[in-house]
UniProtKB/Swiss-Prot annotation:
This is Hydroxylamine oxidoreductase. Heme c 7 binds at C334, C337, H338, H483. The keyword NAD does not apply. Its EC number is 1.7.2.6, 1.7.2.9. Heme c 8 binds at H303, C384, C387, H388. PROSITE patterns: MULTIHEME_CYTC (PS51008). Heme c 4 binds at C253, C256, H257, Y491. The lineage of its organism: Bacteria, Pseudomonadati, Pseudomonadota, Betaproteobacteria, Nitrosomonadales.
Length: 570
């Protein structure tokens, strides 16, 4: 070994002994993630952990980029903000080369609200965190800051004894702790989840662990889904999203499927408030509406009403772990229930998922009593028993499961009827006016595409009705049950609307059968070389099936009478 190499090795060892090696054994990140990344959780440094996470995060084979249907669509102007890693390019103006303070000065004039929000943020006030006293309920933030600085030292972005002065524009939009100037037309980036993960490694790793723990026993959903970690992948791998030419409509879906790409859906820029993200309203923008009305169901539940009535008395700044004990919280919130897993609070919100919102997905209901599902049910019981007895919790969760299965059975009966019509070729226009959907979608019955694309009689009205019964009404029934909103699964939403859809489907099916019987009767009569207008026998004047047959028969009899009168006069 050469002397120079030997000296460098000696100095490195000495440095490590002096400052100690920081390991990233993050207790809230499950073993499955360390295994998937091929890391030893007891030895991996923050740098090694971060690099392994980012390598997977940016790998097209693991969901990055345009996806497998990328040839069928092109980004529009707004797309650069939906998936910055793939599409964002720095602006061509202003042609400025600026340092840290210049960003704030310029944007105070150009985008003043951004700057005001940032000045209120923890990012802009790190010394306030350092000065917190141990009896302050926010004291935990001091430990978080120290963890962030240790991460940055491991990554070589902060000196051994250096502290982070602030997190300003240049840190997120160029590079953390950048000392020199940046070219506005070359160096600017739009922050993505891995940008935030540079400092917030724990939270990034927790969120990314959804890929490893959301694995269904029989492949009911693709691995890692549904989740925040792969919600953009789920979006662009949806056939109709890639197929539809109305790209502005498609990007409406994207706007709620960008948690994979960035963190500001929950932590709004440029304040990035943890307190804001703990409030139920932070979830409402996306977890609402006709196919997943979680917000509506929660707010109309007793849980939601308690939160609404008492929220002004709660300290939203305390960490979730302390919300009930130190923050005055006395009712569940979205975060309190869904971010909790067996006593820990993390950004992995899928470890208790059992129904995944859509009970009609093949294999979901069949799996609900499996050991996999029962273990997750037990984890939910632990969540619920923070406020309820175990007997009550298990009783209610049993009601939820069985109520969902009852709704599923109602849908399945209706779906079987419409599917038979499809197989028989008797849906409206099925043989005469049913254009194929745009590529890459393939023709089929009751496919998700038909909620967002239509042409001619594709889909038929009954086909769309039973599809909405599954995607919307059954989903809302389950959500109402899961969020303890009685009207949300019995009357206003769920069972009531499903019952109406069922009745309408049965009505149309019966009319179709009667019309078919009428057609068969007419065909039979024509086969006797007898015109319908020449009916004479009483047996041939019987009802031919429903209103249509009756009207046709009445018209025929009137014409027969007219012919007889004409013959008599002649």
């Amino acid at each position: 070994m050469r002397i120079g190499e030997w000296m460098r090795g000696l100095l490195l060892c000495a440095g490590l002994m002096m400052c100690g090696v920081v390991h990233a054994d993050i207790s809230t990140v499950p073993d499955e993630t360390y295994d998937a990344l091929k890391l030893d959780r007891g030895k991996a440094t923050p740098k090694e952990t971060y690099e392994a996470l980012v390598k997977r995060y940016k790998d097209p084979a693991h969901g990055a980029g345009k996806g497998t249907m990328g040839d069928y669509w092109e980004p529009i102007a707004i797309s650069i903000y939906m998936d910055p890693n793939t599409f964002y390019k720095p602006p061509v103006s202003p042609k400025e080369v600026a340092e840290r303070k210049d960003c704030v000065e310029c944007h105070s004039d150009e985008t003043p609200v951004w700057v005001r929000a940032w000045k209120r943020s923890t990012h802009a006030n790190l010394d306030k965190i350092r000065n917190l006293k141990s009896d302050d309920p926010l004291y935990y933030k001091k430990g978080k800051l120290e963890e962030v600085e240790n991460n940055l030292r491991s990554m070589g972005k902060l000196g051994e004894k250096e502290t982070l002065k602030e997190v300003g524009c240049i840190d997120c939009h160029v590079d953390v702790n950048k000392k020199d100037k940046a070219d506005h037309t070359k160096d600017i980036r739009m922050p993505t989840a891995d940008t935030c993960g540079t400092c917030h490694l724990r939270e990034f790793a927790e969120r990314e662990s959804e890929r490893d723990t959301m694995v269904w026993p029989n492949g009911q959903w693709p691995a890692g889904r549904p989740s925040h970690a792969l919600d953009y992948t789920a979006n662009i791998e949806t056939t109709v999203w890639a197929a539809m030419p109305q790209r502005e409509v498609a990007e409406g879906c994207t706007m709620c499927h960008t948690n994979q790409n960035k963190c500001d859906n929950c932590h709004t820029r440029h304040e990035f408030s943890a307190a804001e993200s703990r409030k139920p309203e932070a979830c409402a923008t996306c977890h609402s509406g006709v196919d997943h009305n979680n917000w509506e169901a929660y707010t109309m539940s007793k849980h939601g009403k308690l939160a609404e009535m008492n929220r002004d008395k709660w300290n939203w700044e305390v960490r979730l772990k302390d919300a009930f004990s130190k923050g005055g919280q006395n009712a569940p919130t979205c975060a309190a229930c869904h971010m909790e897993y067996e006593g820990e609070y993390t950004h992995n919100i899928t470890r208790k998922t059992r129904w995944a919102n859509y009970p009609f997905v093949p294999g979901i209901a069949e799996n609900i009593t499996s050991d996999w599902s029962e273990a997750r049910l037990d984890s939910w019981v632990l969540t619920c028993t923070q406020c309820h007895s175990e007997r009550f919790a298990r009783s209610y969760l049993d009601l939820m499961d069985k109520g969902t299965l009852e709704g599923l059975a109602k849908y399945q009966e209706a779906n079987a009827i419409v599917h038979k019509m499809y197989e028989d070729g008797t849906l409206t226009g099925q043989k005469t006016n049913r254009p194929n959907p745009p590529e890459p979608e393939k023709p089929g019955f009751g496919i998700f595409t038909q909620l967002f694309w239509s042409k001619g009689n594709n889909p038929a009205s009954l086909e769309l009705k039973v599809l909405e019964m599954a995607e919307n009404n059954l989903a809302k029934m389950h959500v109402g049950l899961a969020h303890v909103n009685p009207g949300g699964w019995t009357y206003t939403e769920g069972w009531g609307p499903m019952n109406r859809a069922y009745v309408e489907i049965q009505d149309e099916y019966t009319k179709m059968q009667e019309l078919s019987a009428l057609q068969a009767r007419v065909n039979k009569l024509e086969g006797k070389q007898t015109s319908l207008l020449d009916l004479k026998g009483t047996g041939e004047k019987i009802s031919l099936g429903g209103l249509g047959g009756g009207m046709l028969l009445a018209g025929a009899l009137a014409l027969i009478g007219w012919r007889k009168r004409k013959q008599t006069r002649a």
